Structure formats: structure tokens, C-alpha cells
């Protein structure tokens, strides 16, 4: 179980939770059985209207925190994690989502890895669990594009200005977190994990980012509606050239389908040699998608995910343009989005 606060936790695990009754129990079961390091667990109940608070309170070693009213210009998550950090007593802070499940011993290993890498921020991209057509088709495409846009090797390189992190698993030293102002420094950002990594790296601290399927797994979305809302919030911020990327995805999809049709017609005609030539484009597309750590069946479905990815990119871009983005039952617009844009301009300058 989690080490009591009185014993001096090395790590404070902070979980913001808003209506997470479907996943919080599994998350806490995986965290309360961690071994090898003193730690505490704090769940910040961000105005849940379901059984989230009751589930958290059912774990004796878990502290449940109320973040208080949402200040003007703040996002709900940033307010919640700031409240958690204020109550935390650890030398390290692990911000993790309620829909994550942590491998046995992963907490101690993560802190050891951060120290071995001399990193003040360690972030893992979890193994993504996907079910059903929409998740299996769309998620591999998005994560392949993320791997291209934000290569972990460059983010972990102190000589590179590129920086990003995944808020599903973000371990940061208390020293670095407090030095840059914590989440209060990115209070208005809807992409707080990336923004926090940028300001921490810009302040001279080292970050390490990698695929972390050996440490943590998650299922981000459980319906197409959740998937659409979540990526609408994120994609335009992750990919500033969202319109161009959407057009390219549609072109790639059209090229793949055309090549498959030509290949099929040649096979029917008995011309296998030229049919194989037309399969080069679909093969290269699937191999690119395969960099995202999904199953081969999901990578193949990713071909059908290309136009859906384009739709989500355009929807995200339009939502930010009109100033209305919703997440977890809250509508963000006007000052919050404008402030987030200004924050992002200030931190992106000089980054590729």
C-alpha cells in the first residue's frame, strides 16, 4: 500500500479526476500496490457528479482533495493538479490520469530512471489500449504523426530546443516544478503537459521522454464521442499546420486506395508483378503507422483512419478559430483560449 505521509514520501502521485468512475478503481488498485519506494497518492476530485469521490475514498491510503472554485482563465485540469501539488509532500511529483493502469514496480523504476538520466522531468507515452473500429483506426494514425512531430530522441536531447511530455505520465522533480511556477505558469493552456515540458527545458532542466508501455497503459477514450471531443481539444495545438496536415492525410488516403484498386485489378488480370509495384504505397503507409506501437491489425485499419484524422484536425482547427472548445463538461472560449494562444506563442518560439 502507499506509504503514509508521516513516513516522508519520495513521490507524490497526483491524479486529477472528473467523472472517472469507469476507470479510477483500476488505476488506484495498480498504484496502491506499488513497492520499492515511499510514496503517497492524492486524488483531486474536480467537481465529479458520479461515484469518483466514493471510489477514491474507498482506498484507505488515498487522500482526496477538493480543488475549490475554478479561477477565471484557468482550465479545470490545471486548477486540479495545482491543488494537488500544493498538498503534496514528495520530492518528486507524478502527474498521471485516472484512466491509467501502472505496472508493478513501475513507480520505483521511473524515479530510478530519472535519476540515472539526470532528468528533472521524465514522461512516458503509455501503451494505448484500443477497442472497436474508431479507436483502432484513428489512434495509430495520430500517434504515428505525434512520433514524427515530436521524436523522443530530440526531446531527450539537451542540445535540442524541442520539448514535449505526455500528461498521462509526467514525473517531475519538486525543485524544477516549483522553479518554473508549476501548472500555474500554464494555467490557461489546454495542452498543459507540452507547455510545462517546454518551460522546464527552456529553464535549463533536462527532460527524458520515451514510449513507456513497460510502465503504464491506458485506454484514453471509450466512445467515438469521447475520442472526437478529446482530439478536438488537442490536435490544433499539437499540429499548428493542421489544415495542411489534413489535406495531406486525404491525399495519402486517396493514393493508397487508388493503388489498392489498381493492384486488385492487375491481380484479377493475372499480372502479379505489376500488382506488387502498386502495393508499395500502401506498404509504406502501413509501415509509417506501425511506428506508433499498436497491433498490426490496428495498423492496417489505420489506412481507414486517415480521413477520420483529417476530419478531426479540421474540426479542432475550426473549434479554436471560433473560440469554443469543450472538455469534461466545460466549455472553454474567449479569454481562456486567447490566453492559451499567447502562452503557446511565448513558449514555441524557436522550436521546430
What is the predicted role of each segment?
Residues 9-12, 40:
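Cell-envelope/extracellular polymer assembly enzymes that use nucleotide-activated donors
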Residues 22-26, 50-58, 105:
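Acidic helix N-cap motif at the loop->helix transition within catalytic regions
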Residues 29-38:
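Short, acidic, metal-binding catalytic loop of nucleotide-sugar glycosyltransferases
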Residues 30, 45-54, 69:
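A conserved acidic beta->alpha catalytic loop
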Residues 51, 98-113:
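Acidic donor-binding/catalytic loop of UDP-sugar-dependent glycosyltransferases
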Residues 66-86, 109, 113-179, 235, ...:
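Long helical/loop segments within the catalytic core of UDP-sugar-dependent glycosyltransferases
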Residues 114, 121-147, 175-178, 183-245, ...:
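Catalytic donor/gating beta->alpha subdomain of glycosyltransferases that bind UDP-sugars
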Residues 252-322:
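Membrane-embedded multi-pass helical conduit in multi-pass membrane proteins
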Amino acid at each position: 500500500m502507499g506509504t503514509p505521509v508521516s513516513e516522508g514520501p519520495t513521490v507524490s502521485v497526483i491524479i486529477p479526476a472528473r467523472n472517472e468512475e469507469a476507470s479510477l478503481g483500476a488505476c488506484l488498485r495498480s498504484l496502491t500496490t506499488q513497492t520499492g519506494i515511499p510514496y503517497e497518492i492524492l486524488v483531486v476530485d474536480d467537481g465529479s457528479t458520479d461515484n469518483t469521490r466514493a471510489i477514491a475514498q474507498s482506498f484507505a491510503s488515498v487522500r482526496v482533495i477538493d480543488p475549490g472554485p475554478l479561477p477565471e482563465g484557468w482550465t479545470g485540469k490545471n486548477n486540479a493538479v495545482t491543488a494537488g501539488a500544493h498538498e503534496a509532500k514528495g520530492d518528486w511529483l507524478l502527474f498521471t490520469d485516472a484512466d491509467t493502469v501502472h505496472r508493478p514496480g513501475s513507480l520505483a523504476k521511473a524515479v530510478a530512471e530519472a535519476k540515472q538520466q539526470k532528468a528533472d522531468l521524465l514522461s512516458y507515452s503509455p501503451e494505448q489500449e484500443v477497442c472497436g473500429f474508431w479507436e483502432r483506426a484513428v489512434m495509430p494514425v495520430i500517434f504515428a504523426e505525434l512520433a514524427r512531430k515530436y521524436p523522443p530522441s530530440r526531446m531527450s536531447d539537451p542540445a535540442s530546443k524541442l520539448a514535449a511530455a505526455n500528461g498521462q505520465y509526467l514525473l517531475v522533480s519538486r525543485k524544477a516544478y516549483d522553479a518554473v511556477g508549476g501548472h500555474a505558469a500554464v494555467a490557461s493552456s489546454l495542452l498543459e503537459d507540452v507547455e510545462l515540458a517546454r518551460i522546464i527545458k527552456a529553464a535549463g532542466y533536462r527532460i527524458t521522454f520515451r514510449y513507456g508501455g513497460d510502465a503504464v497503459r491506458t485506454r484514453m477514450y471509450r466512445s467515438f464521442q469521447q475520442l472526437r471531443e478529446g482530439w478536438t481539444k488537442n490536435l490544433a495545438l499539437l499540429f499548428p499546420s493542421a489544415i495542411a496536415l489534413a489535406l495531406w492525410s486525404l491525399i495519402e488516403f486517396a493514393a493508397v486506395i487508388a493503388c489498392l484498386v489498381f493492384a486488385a485489378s492487375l491481380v484479377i488480370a493475372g499480372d502479379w508483378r505489376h500488382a506488387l509495384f502498386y502495393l508499395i504505397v500502401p506498404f509504406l503507409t502501413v509501415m509509417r503507422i506501425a511506428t506508433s506501437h499498436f497491433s498490426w491489425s490496428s495498423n492496417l485499419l489505420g489506412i481507414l483512419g486517415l480521413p477520420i484524422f483529417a476530419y478531426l484536425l479540421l474540426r479542432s482547427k475550426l473549434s479554436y478559430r471560433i473560440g469554443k472548445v469543450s472538455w469534461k463538461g466545460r466549455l472553454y472560449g474567449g479569454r481562456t483560449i486567447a490566453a492559451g494562444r499567447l502562452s503557446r506563442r511565448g513558449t514555441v518560439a524557436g522550436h521546430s
